[in-house]
């Protein structure tokens, strides 16, 4: 069992066990209980009443955070038809099949996310088993398979985050950094919860959202009212 650090114990002591906090108070507490020396990420975790084994309850998508993520992502655009648009949108890397081969043959991953135009998807299928486990496979549901590569790159660079329910029905999303003002984190939280409610499967019965927890990198979990 991993040893709990003194800093984490001190942070944990500030959070009342089983208490569910109003959003503003929870965010303030998350900032107070950040245990790292760097600018930690603030994350929200939704525990949903879904069964991801059912096809109609597999939740996946992307949401634009109005206050941004506080993180810069390296974007790879794979295209044969929209090279100029991708370059003008300031994608970090732009190319075609030669980059797919580089991923396949050199285990190259000098990027955070892939945007692809539709004609590239058949070729990308050849490395689906490589990209899939890393969460890098482009998908129309997240807006990463598109002919409008300029918008996709712009959204990602500025403020878009992807989400996907795991096999336990949990969704984890970044809503900013500890250095963000509370108001900015609130903006992002509200955008995220609105999105999660929007994609509620029609077949879900009873309460859809079971609980919501806020945390920072290596910080304690804080339950949030909703």
Curated annotation (Swiss-Prot):
GO biological process, one term: regulation of translation
CDD domains documented for this protein: Ribosomal_L1
GO molecular function terms attached to this record: rRNA binding; structural constituent of ribosome; tRNA binding
A Pfam family of this chain: Ribosomal_L1
One term under GO cellular component: large ribosomal subunit
PROSITE patterns named among the record's database cross-references: RIBOSOMAL_L1
Keywords, sorted A to Z: Repressor, Ribonucleoprotein, Ribosomal protein, RNA-binding, rRNA-binding, Translation regulation, tRNA-binding
Function: Binds directly to 23S rRNA. The L1 stalk is quite mobile in the ribosome, and is involved in E site tRNA release. Protein L1 is also a translational repressor protein, it controls the translation of the L11 operon by binding to its mRNA.
Self-association and partners: Part of the 50S ribosomal subunit.
Family classification: Belongs to the universal ribosomal protein uL1 family.
Protein name, as recorded: Large ribosomal subunit protein uL1
Source organism: Mycoplasma mycoides subsp. mycoides SC (strain CCUG 32753 / NCTC 10114 / PG1)
């Amino acid at each position: 069992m991993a040893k709990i650090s003194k800093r984490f114990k001190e942070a944990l002591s500030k959070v009342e066990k089983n208490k569910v906090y109003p959003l503003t108070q929870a965010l303030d507490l998350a900032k107070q209980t950040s245990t790292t020396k760097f600018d930690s990420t603030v994350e929200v975790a939704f525990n949903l009443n879904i069964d991801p084994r059912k096809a109609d309850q597999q939740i996946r998508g992307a949401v634009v955070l109005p206050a941004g993520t506080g993180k810069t992502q390296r974007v790879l655009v794979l295209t044969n038809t929209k090279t100029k648009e991708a370059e003008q949108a300031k994608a970090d890397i732009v190319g075609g099949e030669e980059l797919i081969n580089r991923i396949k043959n050199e285990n190259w991953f000098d990027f955070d996310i892939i945007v692809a135009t539709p004609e590239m998807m058949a070729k990308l299928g050849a490395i689906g088993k490589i990209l899939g486990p890393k969460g890098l496979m482009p998908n129309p549901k997240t807006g990463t398979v598109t002919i409008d590569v300029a918008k996709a790159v712009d959204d990602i660079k500025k403020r878009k985050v992807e989400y996907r329910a795991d096999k336990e029905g949990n969704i984890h999303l970044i809503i900013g950094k500890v250095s963000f003002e509370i108001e900015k984190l609130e903006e992002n939280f509200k955008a995220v919860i609105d999105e999660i409610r929007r994609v509620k499967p029609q077949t879900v019965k009873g309460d859809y959202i079971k609980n919501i927890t806020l945390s920072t990198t290596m910080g304690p979990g804080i339950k949030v009212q909703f």
